[in-house]
Amino acid sequence: MKQAVIVDCIRTPMGRSKGGVFRNVRAETLSAELMKALLLRNPGVDPNTIEDVIWGCVQQTLEQGFNIARNASLLAGVPKTAGAVTVNRLCGSSMEALHQASRAIMTGMGDTFIIGGVEHMGHVPMNHGVDFHPGLAANVAKASGMMGLTAEMLGKLHGISREMQDQFAVRSHQRAHAASIEGRFANEIYAIEGHDANGALIKVDYDEVIRPETTLESLAGLRPVFDPANGTVTAGTSSALSDGAAAMLVMEEEKARALGLTIRARVRSMAVAGCDAAIMGYGPVPATQKALARAGLSIQDMDVIELNEAFAAQSLPCVKDLGLMDVVEDKVNLNGGAIALGHPLGCSGARISTTLINLMEHKDATLGLATMCIGLGQGIATVFERV
């Protein structure tokens, strides 16, 4: 079987969704800038050999509608001979894009793909136009469609206290801030134009959503936002609302080697899994278990792990049941996570994979895992190997 490899991976800075640096920048532009950048950064790749552009996006309406993958690729100047498709596995959409490209490569259905995803949550709100079928209530509780309440449920089932959540959130901001000021995000962020608070055009090369001033004391003062009477999940322990995109150049390994390209990582294994929608945040556990089994590996073999931080109350049960509690500080989300950086839905799978690959290079690690939960009860996971 042919092997799928990552030749390059980049992301935009993460902009704050409410009045942030990308308030005047459309989702197609965020996407197109990265597509163009991948081709500029890799002149050895003939754009005419691109088989498909596979782009994740959840809210496929307004500026994100009518196949944003094609709209953005045309905007970017990707050759018209390349296909383009927008995929939606909710939070796992851009990791799904990676999986689709990898499967195509493994089965000989193309050797060069641009994949990634975007979500401009400031322009297209997460719940815009959502209309669940009334009959769904026969099988799934209404609260299962409310992500914050599913985090509350999962946290309660696993004994995750408010204090544990606050500590996890502070860690996310502290680590993301340290990574930012120490330049550890520099290799993954592709600077693009945005606007400052006064409306002046600026080149944005930093994540706007990190809050370095976050402390246990400041978080302790926040009220539960999803279950005000009995809950523990606050805005401070939930992923930030942000706007952003991430992209990867995925190729067949022998083709990349023949072109003399640097291979940054190989896709070792992939998996998706379902779980009860009421505890949707638990999805990374079965997805990771499947991906590891397919690779013939164990969680102990993973040198670096990126777990998307939808909520602290969701992340901690996954850390616990994956057997990672004792190695969190050494292996898990070493540059912070979505609590600090935000979770632009369609972007996040490619974003955490990009961060993971850069961390693997920084630590000279061999194996890494990127995994995330998905609304309504799914998980997705990818094992990467440096070669």
From Swiss-Prot:
Annotated InterPro entries: FadA, Thiolase, Thiolase-like, Thiolase-like_sf_Thiolase, Thiolase_acyl_enz_int_AS, Thiolase_AS, Thiolase_C, Thiolase_CS
UniProt keyword RNA-binding, yes or no: no
Organism: Shewanella amazonensis (strain ATCC BAA-1098 / SB2B)
PANTHER family according to UniProt: 3-KETOACYL-COA THIOLASE FADA, 3-KETOACYL-COA THIOLASE, PEROXISOMAL
GO molecular function: acetyl-CoA C-acyltransferase activity
PROSITE patterns: THIOLASE_1, THIOLASE_2, THIOLASE_3
Annotated family: Belongs to the thiolase-like superfamily. Thiolase family.
Name of the protein this chain belongs to: 3-ketoacyl-CoA thiolase
Pfam families (alphabetical): Thiolase_C (PF02803), Thiolase_N (PF00108)
Subcellular location(s) per record: Cytoplasm
Gene Ontology biological process terms, A to Z: fatty acid beta-oxidation; phenylacetate catabolic process
Active-site residues, record numbering mapped to chain: 91, 343, 373
Enzyme Commission identifier(s): 2.3.1.16
One Gene Ontology cellular component: cytoplasm
Self-association and partners: Heterotetramer of two alpha chains (FadB) and two beta chains (FadA).
Function: Catalyzes the final step of fatty acid oxidation in which acetyl-CoA is released and the CoA ester of a fatty acid two carbons shorter is formed.
Disulphide linkage map: none
Keywords assigned by UniProt, alphabetized: Acyltransferase, Cytoplasm, Fatty acid metabolism, Lipid degradation, Lipid metabolism, Transferase
Pathway the protein takes part in: Lipid metabolism; fatty acid beta-oxidation
Catalytic reactions of this protein: an acyl-CoA + acetyl-CoA = a 3-oxoacyl-CoA + CoA
